């Protein structure tokens, strides 16, 4: 009885009594299979032959003996590892080179463990705690001070000021007026109720007013131009009897020369320089 023939799919050499490899149900001699189908090792660039173990990670292949940490050269076979810039690193080397350090305990935050980030620093989840109650803050609201981070209840208990207007806690910013704290959004003109936090303002009987309201309600009016005399920014004004003038408005009613620092004469509600007033039946 004739023995059936069994050939390599590629080179057609007989495979009887020889090792072979099946690929898509087709037989290949070992040399043809290695030449045609073998992957190339990422490390040594040699083919990974059919008799060798082929280790694959993200489409790249290694011989078992080449699958090592690129920094310490220890084998990564059946060990945890991580990739950094296409380099494979064992857990220890990755931690030393790439992992963040906890801002509190200064120890490495291991890959895969949960970490908290705040203002560019990192913490172990168990190290990111309220400075007062020592409970983990996690993703809950917090308030930061130079002395540390605080959960909202502890901050309110230890540090918070209460707004003089709404009586609620001031958690950040705020304004002090008459030694009393205010939310910026609560510090309003007592007349028109607009916010004063970015405005110049005046006060009357301990109440704040924007300049428009204060001038309208309380400022004296210039006897010449009738506009308010505010006295802001060191503005100068002249008082005589029961009348006031802006210094730039205190001029002779006839020739308009400035009378600031000069002698003057009056007639009814007019003021004159001595020259112009000499021909007028003046009061002085």
From Swiss-Prot:
A zinc finger (C4-type) spans 8-32. It holds the Pfam family LIM_FHL2-3_N. Keywords: LIM domain, Metal-binding, Nucleus, Repeat, Zinc, Zinc-finger. GO terms for biological process: positive regulation of transcription by RNA polymerase II. Residues 39-100, 101-160, 161-220, 223-283 form the LIM zinc-binding domain. SUPFAM superfamilies: Glucocorticoid receptor-like (DNA-binding domain). GO terms for molecular function: transcription coactivator activity; zinc ion binding. It is found in: Nucleus. GO terms for cellular component: nucleus; Z disc. The keyword Ion transport does not apply. Its main location: nucleus. Transmembrane segments: none annotated. CDD domains: LIM2_FHL5, LIM3_FHL, LIM4_FHL. Interacts with CREM (via the third LIM domain). Interacts (via second LIM domain) with SPAG8. This is Four and a half LIM domains protein 5. The gene is FHL5.
């Amino acid at each position: 009885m004739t023995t059936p023939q069994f050939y390599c799919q590629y080179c057609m050499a007989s495979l009887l009594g020889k090792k072979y490899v099946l690929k898509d149900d087709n037989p290949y001699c070992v040399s043809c299979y290695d030449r045609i189908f073998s992957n190339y090792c990422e490390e040594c660039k040699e083919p990974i032959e059919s008799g060798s173990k082929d280790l694959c990670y993200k489409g790249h292949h290694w011989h078992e003996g080449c699958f090592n940490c690129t920094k310490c050269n220890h084998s990564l076979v059946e060990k945890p590892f991580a990739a950094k810039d296409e380099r494979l690193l064992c857990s220890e080397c990755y931690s030393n080179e790439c992992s963040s350090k906890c801002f509190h305990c200064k120890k490495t935050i291991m890959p895969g463990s949960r970490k908290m980030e705040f203002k560019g620093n990192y913490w172990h989840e168990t190290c990111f705690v309220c400075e007062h109650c020592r409970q983990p803050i996690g993703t809950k609201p917090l308030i930061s001070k130079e002395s540390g981070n605080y959960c909202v209840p502890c901050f309110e208990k230890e540090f918070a000021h209460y707004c003089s207007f709404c009586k609620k806690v001031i958690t950040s910013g705020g304004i002090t007026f008459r030694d009393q704290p205010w939310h910026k959004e609560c510090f309003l003109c007592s007349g028109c109720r607009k916010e004063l936090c970015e405005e110049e303002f005046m006060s009357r009987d301990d109440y704040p007013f924007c300049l428009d309201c204060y001038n309208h309600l309380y400022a004296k009016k210039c006897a010449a131009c009738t506009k308010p005399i505010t006295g802001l920014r060191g503005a100068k004004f002249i008082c005589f009897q029961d009348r006031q003038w802006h210094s730039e408005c205190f001029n002779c009613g006839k020739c308009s020369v400035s009378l600031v620092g000069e002698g003057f004469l009056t007639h009814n509600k007019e003021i004159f320089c001595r020259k112009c007033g000499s021909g007028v039946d003046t009061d002085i």
